[in-house]
Amino acid sequence: MQTRWEHLNDEFSLLTRAQALALDGHFVMEQQVRNKAGFFINFNGTAGIWRKSCILDAGNWQPDTLTEDLDLSYRAQLKGWKFIFINDFTSPSELPIEINALKNQQFRWTKGAIETAKKILPLVWKSSIPLKIKLYSTFHLTMNIVFPLIMIAGLLAVPLVYVKNTGNYDEYFAFMSIFTLAFISSFLMYMYSQKDVYPDWKRRIYLFPVFMAGSMGFALNNTKAVIEGLLNKKSEFVRTPKFRIESDTDNPHPKKKKYAVTKISPMIILELIFALWALFGIGLAAYYTEIAAIPFLSMYFLGYGVIAVMSIKHALESKK
């Protein structure tokens, strides 16, 4: 049985509010709909209850992936065990308040899912479960492949602005406008997740552009995780610091400093370069009056730029 996470500190900062929006979409929409439709869902590592007999029958916890909860969930359901997701019963959880800790968490979840996909998908397709479950399980376990695609889209968006204005390609670019439907469907998913659980959902859904920019900004961090997972490069399980932050007046830095991330990753340099590339693209789009490209490139610029600056700022603060 898996319950929905409820956030103790979602109002602590813009960072925690954006995370809450993302996780609400996962629990309220993805987990609930998957479960009701009869597809496999995953235990989220906490806020749930297992039968001991289920764990043992599925082969027990295994340390060969970074997402042992996802791995065990699929092995159990392939054995015929049924999972239940309860949306109306919530369990308190603390969101990461520090960007480098969030990066580590996202890296772990992304890489672990790829490792689990490589391990579990052969078992899924050899099993006797219905084809629709096999297909959806494949989409579920490989969905993090989207991060390299997001990164590539950001890189290519800049030269595409130039190409569009130096040749007769209008009909091709007109066809590409269909991809705006992806933004609309994503917005609707998160809107309904907020509407389902919050009376003030209209105030919360305004964070959607922040969430989208953040997702783009995490593309580089998570692409590295995808590549390492595909190449079987092993890494340690880096825990997410918890500071018992329940309001915006709590000060996290004196508490549990040994868990704080104090190293400035070389990845930040790449994030800054990507931000400058997007900024150049914004200037190019303005020069060619490609107004439609500016919001897209702006989200890349803000995503990479803000995450890079916050990474440096939070690492330096943790050293104090």
Segments and roles (model prediction):
Residues 1-66, 77-78, 99-138, 142:
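Long helical/loop segments within the catalytic core of UDP-sugar-dependent glycosyltransferases
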Residues 143-236, 242, 266-320:
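Membrane-embedded multi-pass helical conduit in multi-pass membrane proteins
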Residues 64, 73-92:
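Catalytic donor-sugar/metal-binding loop of nucleotide-sugar-dependent glycosyltransferases
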Residues 24-27, 52, 89, 123, ...:
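Conserved helix-loop functional segments at active or binding sites
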Residues 10, 93-94:
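Generic structural signal for helix capping and beta-alpha/helix-loop junctions
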Residues 94-111, 200-209, 234-252:
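Nucleotide-sugar-dependent glycosyltransferase catalytic core
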